[in-house]
Structures are given as structure tokens and as C-alpha cells.
């Protein structure tokens, strides 16, 4: 439905309706349970030697010789999804979003008793990035080979597939993967600034080196590493990652040079030009635009930056309004399609990544709008301006974010939770090698490449292991979902699907416990950003 200002009565009615819907949703879902389970998922995806405190007991050590042939230690990190390749670009994006999630809602994560687990999830990734960044101008961007890996169905503990490692360097650049890794380490450095200052400093050092590498030696990483093209091709190029990394480094350091970079290159790199309707591991423009708009609305800039930051904000609000279906001009592509049940729909394969990322961006932006509406910034007030007229206030933007979260948790036509392990109905046949085969600790009998397909992949029954906290690819544009291991487009889960939901679940847990329903749609702000002060508004 397109929004029009037709009077105060209608506006008040819309806000009251949004508040009522949000209050009803709060009563339906246990967000604290969702938070706990979402963090378990990252333990299921761990590669390397598992720690003594490992809670996902059906996993064991794996990938213990990664990097050995190349003479580097690349043990650790995360498997991206249901296979066993370690892809650097989506892994780094996962860590960036986990970190941003904590920077916005870390106080709520701490209040729920899950801060230590969230920090562990981030550090498991950043410890690996430190290993992978072996020289100032060298980054190991992939371990394993997607082609050989996808021909096998094995537990990671039994892997017989290639563990070839691939790097980017001065001769074979990869500005996108280096830029995203810089962003991840910069964002994580803020997260650890108070709790582990030495580690925070180390992360920031790597982030600055990686950004310099990405900017000086420019090129797409899939041109340097051909093996990644069929799996995580950098379709959007590397300009968005350079802007993204610069803004995260500005947030981490406060240095004007990084903001100057994002402003000076805004037009050439597409930051103020692209009107985007998706945000993902590949396409970062919406995130860039929202980070830049935050600076404007908080007044954290010099006067010479204002004009460019205003244009960033215009594009940020195009994305926000597109997710709400409120851009009244620009044609059919100006808004994101919705399923009959209300799910944002971008494309068939792993659509849930766009849903969860949109929910987080809308929620964060609603906080920024609320701050601007309170007069704390200089960005023109607390209403997002949509293309073709009309707008959306902070409460409405937040209600739209919450609607997507609740869809994931089961408020949908099928009544199915797409967060595995949550609710009465959730996917039982997740496309996930380790989850679909008897645990290694229960049966150490070797399972070969083809044997896994013969004995486990084609089984009709549920997986023997529940990969708790995974968010699967989800339903199609008509809300249809087929729970079948072979249906990888819908039943495979990825780390970057769950990452933005960690903070969202924590924040919604707090709001659902508050007595006044009006607070659930006006602001979600905490004081945990940017320095992880970890106080909670109650």
C-alpha cells in the first residue's frame, strides 16, 4: 500500500495499527529463545579444532591441515553453508553483520545473558582473518574447491575433497574480499574495544592494512580466483566494499580521512548514484548509504560533507521505502516484491538472506530516525522521505522490520518457523552435510564421498542432527516451501542469513517484556554503540 498524508487522524490510526500489530507479534514469539538458538548455529559451522566449551556436540574437529600445502596456517573460520568450503567474502560479511548487530543491540544481547557467546562467534571469524592476512598485501580468500566439494556428501570430519587454498595479492588483486575483510575487522575492533583492548588494536591494524591493500591494488577477486565464480561471484564489483570499509574504519577510528574517502568517491563509486533494493554479501550499497545517513542524522561530520551525506541519505531512504512498498515513482523496480504472506521477495535462491538483512537495516534506520526526530542530529528530522512523495516515521519503519522477523519465526501462511529448532514446525531436512549424517562422535566409521549420497543424502526422514539456529533459504514468492534435502535453494542455510538476526532477537526480547506497547514502535535505541557501553533503556 502506498502512503499518503491525508490528515492527522489517518496518521495516528496507522501508528496505532502498527503498534497493535507489533504488540500482538510480541505475544506470539519467544525472542530470547530465538536469540539463544541463533548463536548456537555458528558453533555448528565452525571449522578447525573445536574448543572445550563447544555446545554443538554432534560436530568435531575438521580441516586441521588447511593451508598446510601452501605453508600457512589456515585452520579455523566458518563453513559458509551446508558444504565445507571456506569462502572469504561471505565469511567476512557474516562477521561484519554480527559486529554491527552487537554495536546496535549489544546491551540487549548482554541483558539476555548471551554476550559471551556472541563475542565468541565474532572472534572465531576474526581469529581466522588474522591468520589469513599473512602479509600487508596478501589475503587468503578461499580454502577448498566448490566443484569437488559439491560432488561429495560427507561430514567435515571425513573430508576427502580438495583443501587447496587461494589468495589475492598485488599481482592478483581482490578489492572486494579485502575490503569486506577490512570492514569486518574494523567493526569487530569496536566491539572488543572495552573488553579486550589489545585484541581490538590488533584487529584495527589489520583492517587498516587491508583497506590500503584493497584501494591501492584494485580488482575483482573473482578475476583473480576463477574457482569462486560459480559460487560467490562479485557481481556488484568492489566499489561498494571500498566505501563500506572506509565508513567502518571511520567509525572505528574517528579519522576524517576515511570519511573524506567515502565522500570524495561517493559519485564515482556509485554510493550516491545507485538506488538499491537489496542488501547482501555481494551488494553493500544500501548498508553504505545507511551508515552515511547515520553520520548525517547524528551530526558526526564536517559542514563540507553535508551535501554528499544528504545524497547518501536520499538513497538510503529509497531502500527503506522500497522495503515498505512506499516508493510511488520509479516503476515496478522501485519497490521490493512481497509474497501474499508479506515476505520481502528478491530472488528464488536463498531469499531469506534479503529478508533478514532488510529487517536489520530497517530496524537500525528506525533508531537513527528516532534520534533525528528528537533533534539530536542535523539530518532533517525523523521521517524517511520516499520517492514520489510521502514518507515513513521511525515507528512505521520499525514495524516493517519486525514484521519480517516474525515471518521468519512462524507468522506466515504456513505457520512454519524458518529458524531451525525454533517453534513447533521448522525444516527437518536441511541441506547440510554434517547435520544429515550420523554424528562423528557416535560413529567414527569413515563415510566416503559417494557413500554419503547413497546412504544419507537421499533419505526421506529428518536429519539425525538438528542444526539449531540456522535460517534456511525459505519459501518462494507465493509462500510455498518444500522441505527436501535436494531442494537446496530453499533448505540450505547460510551464516549470513542468521548474523543480522542476533541483535534483532535480543532487542525484540527486551521490547516484548516491556509493559507499554507504544515503546515497541517508537524507538529501539540502546546505548551500546559505538563503544559497547552495554546499558539498556528500560
Swiss-Prot record:
Transmembrane segments: none
Active site: 83 (nucleophile), 431, 483, 492
Gene Ontology molecular function: cellulase activity
Reactions this protein catalyses: Endohydrolysis of (1->4)-beta-D-glucosidic linkages in cellulose, lichenin and cereal beta-D-glucans
InterPro entries with a match to the protein in the record: 6-hairpin_glycosidase_sf (IPR008928), 6hp_glycosidase-like_sf (IPR012341), Glyco_hydro_9 (IPR001701), Glyco_hydro_9_His_AS (IPR018221)
Bias (Low complexity) ranges: 516-530
GO terms under biological process: cell wall organization; cellulose catabolic process
Keywords carried by this UniProt record: Carbohydrate metabolism, Cell wall biogenesis/degradation, Cellulose degradation, Glycosidase, Hydrolase, Polysaccharide degradation, Secreted, Signal
EC number of this enzyme: 3.2.1.4
Subcellular location: Secreted
Region spans: Disordered: 513-538
GO CC terms, sorted: extracellular region
Domain of life, per lineage: Eukaryota
Key word Secreted present: yes
Signal peptide start-end: 1-26
Enzyme class: hydrolase
Keyword RNA-binding in record: no
Stated family: Belongs to the glycosyl hydrolase 9 (cellulase E) family.
Name under which the protein is recorded: Endoglucanase 16
Native source organism of the sequence: Oryza sativa subsp. japonica (Rice)
